[in-house]
UniProtKB/Swiss-Prot annotation:
The keyword Ribosomal protein applies. The gene is rplR. Disulfide bonds: none annotated. Belongs to the universal ribosomal protein uL18 family. This is Large ribosomal subunit protein uL18. It comes from Leifsonia xyli subsp. xyli (strain CTCB07). Part of the 50S ribosomal subunit; part of the 5S rRNA/L5/L18/L25 subcomplex. Contacts the 5S and 23S rRNAs. One of its GO terms (molecular function) is structural constituent of ribosome. GO terms for biological process: translation. This is one of the proteins that bind and probably mediate the attachment of the 5S RNA into the large ribosomal subunit, where it forms part of the central protuberance. Keywords: Ribonucleoprotein, Ribosomal protein, RNA-binding, rRNA-binding. The keyword Cytoplasm does not apply. HAMAP family: Ribosomal_uL18_B. It holds the Pfam family Ribosomal_L18p.
Length: 124
């Protein structure tokens, strides 16, 4: 894993420090994989990762064709992505996950993904 500017004072450096601190504590297993949220200025990407095998079990993002036509703000789209990844994870046999916010603050779109995943039936 690349360290993202751990020595600077910028927002990106602070996010990198938070991410490395989180990854020391959060590990996805086969029974409880990691729900990884990656956020850009425009899109949200979510993956369910089993760290023991190094495999992605399910994924969803706002760049998918069925979500591009979805009306609403970025937070509403993020909630929809959470519901979609929960549906795909359940079809892959995953019931519970560990939430990895990726160094981002648990607010806004990141929190909306978690709420959508809970509504979709995943246990966070």
């Amino acid at each position: 894993m690349a360290l993202l500017g751990t020595r600077g004072k910028s927002k990106a450096a602070a996010r990198g420090r938070r991410h490395t601190r989180l990854r020391k504590k959060i590990v996805g297993t086969e029974l409880r994989p990691r729900l990884v949220v990656t956020r850009s200025a425009r899109h949200v990407f979510v993956q369910v990762v089993d760290d023991a095998q190094g495999r992605t079990l399910a994924s969803a993002s706002t760049m998918e064709a069925d979500l591009r036509g979805f009306d609403g703000d970025k937070t509403a789209k993020a909630r929809k992505v959470g519901e979609l990844v929960a549906e795909r994870a359940k079809s892959a046999g995953v019931e519970a996950v560990v939430f990895d916010r990726g160094g981002s603050q648990y607010a806004g779109r990141v929190a909306a993904v978690a709420e959508g995943a809970r509504e979709g039936g995943l246990n966070l």
